[in-house]
């Protein structure tokens, strides 16, 4: 696997998240009843950052929760022989709320589908939207993101690597070839 290109640096990621924050506010006509739910691992810190930007623009703190979708994956046995199964409980009441799922990369849509299932098991939100930093195409399910930081068309042989400062010590999006 070798680096093909660096696609987003720290400044580009910050600009993308700033734009996504404005789009979320505009599309929802404000921030009332919005809950951001970040998919573990990298979706959660992105959701926290979106919440910070929205608070900066609107003066309102948006609740942020995380969801572990491990139990909801349809490829659980492909991930590991002994997967780490965590409680998928979301620590924010999402019933009747405008839930926005946040993730780093949208690829096949299977992770997004698992997150939707996990959220619906916690209660019935008013609606669910999806925000992603990168949409790389190759969807296998009829799911699309409502908010996209960057569309990056890829081949199935390419790998998108997202690094988030809170987890990886740096912010970047890179594309690799196998």
UniProtKB/Swiss-Prot annotation:
Keywords: Glycosyltransferase, RNA-binding, Transcription, Transcription regulation, Transcription termination, Transferase. Substrate binds at residues 41-42, 103-111, 136. Belongs to the purine/pyrimidine phosphoribosyltransferase family. PyrR subfamily. Homodimer and homohexamer; in equilibrium. Regulates transcriptional attenuation of the pyrimidine nucleotide (pyr) operon by binding in a uridine-dependent manner to specific sites on pyr mRNA. This disrupts an antiterminator hairpin in the RNA and favors formation of a downstream transcription terminator, leading to a reduced expression of downstream genes. Also displays a weak uracil phosphoribosyltransferase activity which is not physiologically significant. It catalyses: UMP + diphosphate = 5-phospho-alpha-D-ribose 1-diphosphate + uracil. Its EC number is 2.4.2.9. Pfam families: Pribosyltran. The gene is pyrR. A motif (PRPP-binding) lies at residues 99-111. HAMAP family: PyrR (MF_01219). It comes from Clostridium perfringens (strain 13 / Type A). One of its GO terms (biological process) is DNA-templated transcription termination. One of its GO terms (molecular function) is uracil phosphoribosyltransferase activity. This is Bifunctional protein PyrR.
């Amino acid at each position: 696997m070798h680096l093909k290109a660096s696609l987003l640096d720290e400044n580009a990621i910050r600009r993308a998240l700033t734009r996504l924050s404005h789009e979320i506010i505009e599309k929802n006509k404000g921030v009332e009843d919005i809950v951001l739910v970040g998919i573990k691992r990298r979706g959660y810190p992105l959701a926290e950052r979106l919440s910070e930007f929205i608070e900066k623009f609107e003066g309102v703190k948006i609740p942020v929760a995380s969801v572990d979708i491990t139990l909801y994956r349809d490829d659980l046995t492909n991930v590991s022989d002994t997967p780490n199964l965590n409680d998928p409980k979301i620590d924010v009441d999402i019933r009747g709320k405008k839930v926005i799922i946040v993730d780093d990369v949208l690829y096949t849509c299977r992770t997004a589908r698992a997150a939707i299932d996990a959220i619906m098991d916690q209660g019935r939100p008013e609606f669910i939207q999806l925000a992603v930093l990168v949409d790389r195409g190759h969807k296998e399910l009829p799911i699309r993101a409502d908010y996209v930081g960057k569309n990056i068309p890829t081949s199935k042989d390419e790998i998108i690597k997202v690094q988030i400062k809170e987890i990886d010590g740096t912010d970047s999006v890179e594309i690799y070839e196998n």
